[in-house]
UniProtKB/Swiss-Prot annotation:
Record: residues binding Zn(2+) 1: 79, 111, 168
Record's protein name: Acetylornithine deacetylase
Function as written in the Swiss-Prot or TrEMBL entry: Catalyzes the hydrolysis of the amide bond of N(2)-acetylated L-amino acids. Cleaves the acetyl group from N-acetyl-L-ornithine to form L-ornithine, an intermediate in L-arginine biosynthesis pathway, and a branchpoint in the synthesis of polyamines.
Cofactor names: Zn(2+); Co(2+); glutathione
Localization of this protein: Cytoplasm
Main EC class the enzyme belongs to: hydrolase
CDD domains: M20_ArgE (cd03894)
Source lineage: Bacteria, Pseudomonadati, Pseudomonadota, Gammaproteobacteria, Enterobacterales
Amino acid sequence: MIRKIPSFIEVYKSLIQIPTISSNNKLLDQSNKNFIDLLSNYFSDLNFSVKNYQIPHTDKYNMLACVGSGNGGLLLSGHSDTVDFDEKKWTKDPFKLTETNNKFYGLGAVDMKGFFALILEVISSINIKKIIKPIYILATANEETDMSGAKNFIQSTIIKPDCIIIGEPTSLKLINAHKGHMSYSIKVIGDTGHSSNPDHGVNSIEIMHDVIRSLLILKKYFKEEYQHPNFSIPYPTMNLSSIHGGSAINRICPLCILNFEIRPIPGLTLTQIEIVIKEKLETIMKKWSHRIFIKKLFSSVPAYECPHNSGTIKIVEKLCQLNSAAVNYCTEAPFLQRIAPTLILGPGSIEQAHQPDEYLEHYFIQPTKNIITKLINKFCY
């Protein structure tokens, strides 16, 4: 029996008011269980079969809701978590949906709890008894940190939809490619001493100077050797993000730490990048093997592309009257792409994500509902 669920606004409010912060800082990190339980109840009320999966060794959960059976169909996906927030910079309650000036404000309003509210609104208005292929709804955990929700899902699922749509905020532009992300920290350990006698110590900043020179050669190599014309910045980028070292003007610096990131383009794998980093740093690492240490800062995200010759892209482009494009930020797409052709298409601007007073503009509501309806009609009826 299908039960009536609350209105779009009431559902949206209820999703925003449940904190689901993901953070690498354990003091800020929160479970998403209450959110997943609520979302599960909404889909259960709409006659979906719902399963919640705990991410091993965490208090985080994925939800997979399904109606219909058989092969193919459509998977609509989003992440349940949000980033943390600076209360001093917010002028509104992050956990209370505030509607004003044709905008919906709240933490996760655009990234990306609003997408779930819109899915529920559409599902509640269609006749799901007539579908011939399944509709899947996936809500993942930890997208904002290590993407362990998506990684865990693809390792355990057996479903094979015809198409996956991730509803990240793209201003309803169709995205078929994005860069990846890798981050590293290099630590150089020297020997301190008084600066009046430099030969009685080892200056870690001087060694780091040679490390940086090698990294800049690598940066140039990426720009010259790898190109992807669909990106506004068509080559892999490297950013030397921060450097710290030294404690006093009259001391030889004993420790210097450099953090940097690389954003690879499709066609350049994480393994390839790791190999070329080792190659470019090989000489200096051999010279100072006991003084230079490199480690990953965060879990790496591969670059992603759903090829333009994919039948799925052609179907969705025609259906939604959109042309696909590439972006520089990361999503769960490279992981979900392993089980089915995956595209990114969702309401709101990425410029509002992770910002104080995050909001979803009202004018995205009806067009998003129209697109979700078209996608369901195409892939499931």
